[in-house]
């Protein structure tokens, strides 16, 4: 027989047999209908409360035949509710619905929260867009103003360039004029220098002529004096003296004529148009004196510059010595630090240690010695001193503690 756990099918069979039993007059039919009703009620109870493998179930055929059997796992699997019963299924469904409702409510709340956040962000975005629009408007206005300023500046610059070109042309003309004037002055100076040279030459020649004339006059005066002496000595002889006196007078007249001629020559040379006046000569000598003064000033400045250079050489030599000393001290210090870094600290509790190390840096070297004491496993102290091996080096030292945990 086949078990029909469906409540609808069982109810239909029960209704069929009940209606048949009411119409029948046979007691067997009535009993059969009652049995079917009981089995159906039992099955309905199982449909509501559920069943499991091993429990008693009743199979009712279409003709009303009832078969009692123990439920198997296959019967439980074949049941519409998998043996759970309508009550359990409804309970599970109610629980699932409640859970789904809670999940839906939570999701709705989360969605509402997200919507609020999005609304806030949208409002912030709108405000930011408004600020951006305002900033863009301000930027556009500023750019427009800047463009106007650039245009105005360009026009003013163009005008200024034209004015500058005109001024440059005027300056160029002025420079050309000054250049021509300077050239004229240079030519005039060259001519003046030439005339000065010629004047100096003429003055030297006049001076030499004057000296020669003076020498001739002196010689002739001496000759006249000698002749006069001789005339006085010869006064005893009248005729002879008269003749000699006339001769001497003639010579004196000749000497005076020569003197007058020399004076005229000197005057002519002194008044010549090719000779500078005294004022012009004085001006030339003033310029020469100015050049001499400038030369003396330049000599003074040159001497001062030479002294300054000598002072700088002295300072540079001192600075070079200072740098050399600093380089040596630095290398000594690095060598001493290298030696100090090689010292060991004590490792055993309650023990002193004595340690030594050497260190070096380039051409300098140093020796370091130190001692330490470990008080506990966690705490120790040490100290050390280092001295360079070269002369004049200073000592370096360190003191340190160590705590471990």
UniProtKB/Swiss-Prot annotation:
Biotechnological relevance of this protein: Several alleles exist that vary in length, this is allele 3; alleles 1, 2 and 3 generate cross-bactericidal antibodies. About 50% of hypervirulent serogroup B N.meningitidis encode this protein. This is the variant used in the 4CMenB (Bexsero) vaccine. This is the variant used in the 5CVMB vaccine.
Pfam families in the cross-refs: YadA_anchor
Region (Outer membrane translocation of the passenger domain) residue spans: 312-350
Region (Coiled stalk domain): 88-350
Any one Gene Ontology cellular component term annotated for this protein: cell surface
Keywords, comma-separated and alphabetical: Cell adhesion, Cell outer membrane, Coiled coil, Membrane, Signal, Transmembrane, Transmembrane beta strand, Virulence
Induction entry: Barely visible in early log phase, levels increase to a maximum in stationary phase cells (at protein level).
GO biological process terms, semicolon-separated: cell adhesion
Subcellular compartments: Cell outer membrane; Cell surface
Ranges where the record places region Translocator domain: 351-405
Top-level taxon: Bacteria
N-terminal signal peptide: 1-23
Region ranges (Head domain): 24-87
Role: Adheres to and induces bacterial uptake by human epithelial cells in a microfilament-dependent process. Binding is reduced by pronase treatment, suggesting there is a protein receptor on the human cells. Possible human protein receptors include integrin beta-1 (ITGB1) and oxidized low-density lipoprotein receptor 1 (OLR1). Binds to extracellular human Hsp90 (preferentially the beta isoform, HSP90AB1) on monocytes, binding stimulates monocytes in a TLR4-dependent fashion, polymixin B, which binds NadA, blocks the activation. Hsp90 is probably not the first receptor on human monocytes.
Domain notes: The signal peptide, cleaved at the inner membrane, guides the autotransporter protein to the periplasmic space. Insertion of the C-terminal translocator domain in the outer membrane forms a hydrophilic pore for the translocation of the passenger domain to the bacterial cell surface. The N-terminal head domain (24-87) as well as the dimeric coiled-coil region (88-132) are required for binding to human cells. The C-terminal translocator domain (maximally 54 residues) probably targets the protein to the outer membrane. The middle coiled section is responsible for oligomerization.
Family: Belongs to the autotransporter-2 (AT-2) (TC 1.B.40) family.
Protein name: Neisseria adhesin A
The organism of origin for this protein: Neisseria meningitidis serogroup B
């Amino acid at each position: 027989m086949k078990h029909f756990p469906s409540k609808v099918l069982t109810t239909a069979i029960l209704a069929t047999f009940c209606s048949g039993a009411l119409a029948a007059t046979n007691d067997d039919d009535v009993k059969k209908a009652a049995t079917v009703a009981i089995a159906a009620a039992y099955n309905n109870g199982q449909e509501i409360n559920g069943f499991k493998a091993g429990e008693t179930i009743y199979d009712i055929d279409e003709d009303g035949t009832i078969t009692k059997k123990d439920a198997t796992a296959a019967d439980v699997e074949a049941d519409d509710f998998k043996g759970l019963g309508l009550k359990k299924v409804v309970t599970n469904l109610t629980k699932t619905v409640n859970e789904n409702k809670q999940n839906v409510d939570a999701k709705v709340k989360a969605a509402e929260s997200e919507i609020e956040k999005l609304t806030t962000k949208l409002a912030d975005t709108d405000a930011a867009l408004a600020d951006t629009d305002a900033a863009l408007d301000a930027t556009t206005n500023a750019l427009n103003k800047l463009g106007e300023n650039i245009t105005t500046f360009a026009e003013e610059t163009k005008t200024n360039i034209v004015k500058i070109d005109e001024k440059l042309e005027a300056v160029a003309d002025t420079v050309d004029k000054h250049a021509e004037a300077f050239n004229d002055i240079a030519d005039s100076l060259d001519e003046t220098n030439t005339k000065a040279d010629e004047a100096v030459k003429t003055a030297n020649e006049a001076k030499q002529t004057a000296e020669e004339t003076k020498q001739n006059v002196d010689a002739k005066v001496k000759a006249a004096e000698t002749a006069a002496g001789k005339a006085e000595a010869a006064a005893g002889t009248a005729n002879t003296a008269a003749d000699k006196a006339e001769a001497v007078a003639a010579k004196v007249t000749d000497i005076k004529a020569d003197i007058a001629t020399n004076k005229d020559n000197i005057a002519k040379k002194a008044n010549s148009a090719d000779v500078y006046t005294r004022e012009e000569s004085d001006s030339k000598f003033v310029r020469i004196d100015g050049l001499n003064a400038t030369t003396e000033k330049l000599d003074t400045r040159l001497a001062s510059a030479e002294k300054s250079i000598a002072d700088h050489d002295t300072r540079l030599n001192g600075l070079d010595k200072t740098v050399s000393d600093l380089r040596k001290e630095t290398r000594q210090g690095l060598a001493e630090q290298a030696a100090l870094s090689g010292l060991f600290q004590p490792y055993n509790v309650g023990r002193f240690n004595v340690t030594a190390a050497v260190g070096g840096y380039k051409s300098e070297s140093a020796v370091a010695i130190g001692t330490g004491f470990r008080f506990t496993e966690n705490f120790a102290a040490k100290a050390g001193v280092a001295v360079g091996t070269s002369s004049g080096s200073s000592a370096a030292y360190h003191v340190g503690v160590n705590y471990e945990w």
